[in-house]
């Protein structure tokens, strides 16, 4: 089973001592994630070389925990983004690079303090027939990934299929029917029998190979379309040091729910964005975020991976994406400031059509990056994780640690202030005009960088917190002020 349990630093230290005292020769992973003090980034469709440079030059220094990368396995040819989600073999050759480049990226990121999470696709295989990006031939249910022992031919028995006809199968058509969702073909993609011995061994070998290369975690694509117990059995046979999170899209009245998968690992909480977005899009609703989290009907915080949008939803149901500019940035600030779940920041490329693939130009070149500098600014790669306000919230979140939200203050219908313990406070203004006023914070007295604008302690805009915690806040329109003890500008105090 994949690592999931969230532990405090004290408990981790105690557990480590116990393990050292009572076990020998047992490989235990160091990838336990404390959701309330970490964040990761999805570098969608980045090359392995670009990911490695980004870990070294940006993600590591900024304090991000990990990177989710696009599926590294051999896939069908084509420019559309979704070609990556039609695997032909589990060879590590893709639009992003080859296995040597992949392995180098994993190690370089690890040295920079950044883990790699792989988007793993093993619910299905590629549809149709042809030659894959690495030269492998494929043909639907006769794909080279799965070969009958000793025959050299594809084995249709490795797929779910219709009774009496191994060459055909039903299609997913009724989300109220569990069997239909999990044993029929999703949008025509041959559905793997992940409980079948040969398939299970093949997938486990693939996952273990990733772990051997230093990969720290996997996102399980289309987990909803695999029986939770069968998936759990497969994962329990794989490297147990990996952090796993499962894509389970929830829907009203559907037979399959995210809660069915929490025994296997973390789960994507799609309702997070669905409920958060309207409260940012509509005026006057920021005040209602007091009590936000599990009370809103979400998964338990330590089981949830949260996001505003992902590579699928930004082309579909998502109400907030980079195209919403400053409002999207403000919602990201809130997500990174709030302790619920393990937040994932989407890093997009510019697209007009829903099928558009990534830019042909690299992100890193000639010492610069082809990224937008902030909301509303054009560039081939959007790189939301590089927007100053979002990037600097990773360190803010680390400063907040495991502390819950305290002293939630409603300054106006669309202006809120809250702190996390005595180390981090944030004020958000969704108004179309600046807001100024006095608030009471739990921070020690001193001068702090407003990291929304800069985290350079020698030149950042400063906010003075008095010894009693009182502060005068000047918040620009559709923006925020974020202060934490990791970025104090100086030690000058004002006595009150």
Which ranges hold each PLM region?
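Intrinsically disordered, low-complexity acidic segments that are enriched in bulky aromatics
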Residues: 126-131, 135-146, 247-249
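Active-site-proximal helices and loops of the catalytic beta/alpha 8
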Residues: 19, 25-40, 54-60, 64, ...
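Short glycine-centered, acidic/aromatic-flanked micro-motifs in structured strand/loop junctions
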Residues: 43-45, 92, 222
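Cleavable N-terminal signal peptides of Sec/SRP-targeted secreted and luminal proteins
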Residues: 5-6, 11-29
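Active-site mouth loops of central-metabolism enzymes
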Residues: 40-49, 189-200
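Aromatic- and acidic-residue-enriched carbohydrate-binding clefts of CAZyme catalytic domains
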Residues: 35-38, 75-107, 144-193
């Amino acid at each position: 089973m994949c690592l999931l349990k969230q532990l405090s630093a004290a408990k981790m230290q105690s557990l480590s001592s116990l393990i050292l005292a009572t076990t020998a020769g047992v490989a235990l992973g160091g990838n336990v994630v404390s959701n309330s003090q970490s964040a990761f980034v999805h570098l969608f469709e980045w090359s392995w070389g670009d990911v490695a440079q980004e870990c070294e030059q940006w993600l590591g220094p900024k304090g991000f925990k990990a990177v989710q990368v696009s599926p590294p396995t051999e896939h069908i040819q084509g420019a559309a983004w979704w070609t990556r989600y039609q695997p032909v073999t589990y060879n590590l050759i893709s639009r992003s690079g080859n296995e040597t480049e992949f392995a180098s990226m994993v190690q370089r990121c690890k040295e920079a303090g950044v883990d790699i999470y792989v988007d793993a696709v093993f619910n299905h295989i590629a549809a149709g027939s042809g030659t894959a990006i690495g030269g492998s031939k494929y043909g639907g249910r006769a794909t080279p990934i799965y070969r009958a022992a000793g025959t050299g031919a594809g084995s249709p028995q490795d797929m779910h299929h219709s009774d009496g006809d191994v060459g055909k199968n039903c299609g997913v058509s009724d989300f109220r029917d569990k069997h239909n969702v999990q044993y029929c073909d999703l949008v025509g993609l041959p559905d793997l029998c992940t409980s079948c011995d040969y398939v299970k061994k093949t997938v486990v070998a693939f996952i273990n190979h990733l772990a051997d290369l230093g990969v720290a975690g996997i996102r399980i694509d289309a987990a909803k379309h695999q029986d939770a117990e069968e998936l759990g059995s497969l994962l329990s046979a794989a490297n147990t040091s990996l952090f796993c999170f499962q894509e389970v899209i929830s829907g009203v009245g559907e037979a399959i729910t995210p809660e069915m998968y929490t025994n296997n690992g973390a789960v994507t909480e799609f309702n997070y964005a669905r409920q958060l977005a309207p409260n940012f899009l509509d005026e006057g609703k920021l005040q209602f975020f007091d009590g936000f989290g599990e009370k809103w009907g979400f998964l338990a915080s330590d089981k949830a991976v949260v996001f505003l949008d992902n590579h699928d939803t930004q082309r579909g149901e998502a109400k907030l994406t980079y195209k919403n500019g400053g409002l999207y940035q403000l919602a990201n600030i809130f997500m990174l400031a709030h302790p619920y779940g393990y937040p994932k920041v989407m890093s997009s490329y510019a697209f007009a059509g829903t099928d558009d693939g990534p830019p042909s130009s690299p992100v890193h070149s000639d010492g610069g990056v082809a990224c937008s500098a902030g909301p509303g600014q054009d560039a081939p790669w959007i790189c939301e994780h590089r927007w100053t306000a979002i990037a600097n919230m990773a360190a803010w979140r680390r400063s907040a640690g495991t502390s819950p939200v305290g002293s939630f203050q409603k300054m106006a219908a669309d202006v809120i202030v809250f702190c996390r313990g005595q180390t981090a406070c944030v004020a958000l203004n969704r108004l179309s005009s600046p807001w100024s006023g006095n608030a009471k914070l739990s921070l020690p007295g001193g001068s702090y960088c407003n990291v929304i604008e800069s985290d350079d302690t020698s030149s950042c805009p400063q906010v003075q917190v008095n010894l009693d915690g009182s502060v005068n806040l000047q918040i620009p329109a559709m923006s925020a002020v974020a202060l934490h003890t990791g970025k104090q500008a100086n030690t000058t105090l004002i006595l009150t």
